[in-house]
Every structure is written in structure tokens, then in C-alpha cells.
């Protein structure tokens, strides 16, 4: 749409011919690029994907929304196990961003782990690598690619693993200066930390989380274990 006060894109209603939830815009042009690069970059809108291909980034597709669906995950996973979510800067760090990440992660969980399985993607043999590319405020992928290709490439190449992104952005979600805020952050992030198989990777995330919360690492470890017991009946990722 051309009105800045309204939504960027208006899709038609679901029909037998068009179903937004099962469509990846540009996938017909991106298959070879995804195969060659070993990863897919997922953007929100049509223009983001169109501009990316015009400028030579042929592994970019649009998920036509802020979160991936199970149908889209199944399609993407056939081509690659590394997915980068390139978030629009106007929602990056906002509540909408975290809901989008949560829904995308849950879509991967349901496809690869199963609805009734309590394990995590980190423990599957699929080794899904879901990363987040966060851009400067006020810019979306379309604008960044047109004005600063180096910035686009740097952000994509230095995209953060999902858990690292969540830990880094914890202060945006909770008041971690308070003990209550620290507890809420821990309850949400604990299941992901504990689901990591590699001892060294898990220790690294403990260290990152301790730094973010400004507490000793042994305190974080104890709090994470306690929080995970409390949340044992909840989903792997639960944003409150």
C-alpha cells in the first residue's frame, strides 16, 4: 500500500489458489541461491525479497508475514538447515518481534520435534540453526539493501543465534535491575539453555546470561535449574 499510516501489504483472502501461510514469495528464484550459500534469509515483505534479488542476493525469500508457519518451515528445511530471520527495524526489539520469533521457533519445534515431544530442536539430529539479523531502527531490508549493501551483508553474516539474541535483548523485555525481572527472564530462557547438548556451548550461554543479569555464573546456573523445574509443563519458549 502507498499509505504510510496503514499496513505495508494487503493480501487477498485464503483461497484454493492462494494461501499466505503456505507461500514463500520468491522461492522459485531462490532455490539455487539457497543451495549454493547453505542458508536462507527470510524477510517479511514482497519488496524486501524483490530488492534483494535485484541486487544479487539470491537466497532471500519473503514469508509474507512476521512469523514462519509450519508449512513454510517444511519447505525451507528441505533446502537448508540454516535460517536467518531478517527483521524489519520498525518492529525489531518490540513485543511484535518477540512474538514473531516465538511463533517461528514453535513452528520449527512442531515440524522437527513433534507436538507431544518435550525435547528441543537443540537436541535433534536436524541441528536447525535459526539466527536473527537485527537492523538499525527505522530501516527495513529493502531500504538497507538499496542504500548500504555492506551493512546488509554484515548484518546477515553476523546474525546472532536465537538464544544469543534472546539473552542480549532480555533487558528490553524485563526489568532485570529487579530480582523479579531477573526471575522472569530466567524462567523464559532457562529451557533453551538446558536443552543445549554441547557442554561448552551451554557454559558459554550461562556466562552470557550471567553478564546480562549482572550476577555470578553459579547463581545463574542454580536459578536456571530451579526455573526449568517450575516451567516443566510449559513450552520450550514462553514469552510472558
Regions found by a protein language model. Name each.
Residues 1-83, 95-100:
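Phosphate-handling DNA/RNA-contact segment within nucleic-acid enzymes
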Residues 31-40, 67-83, 87-240:
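A charged alpha-helical hairpin associated with nucleic-acid processing machineries
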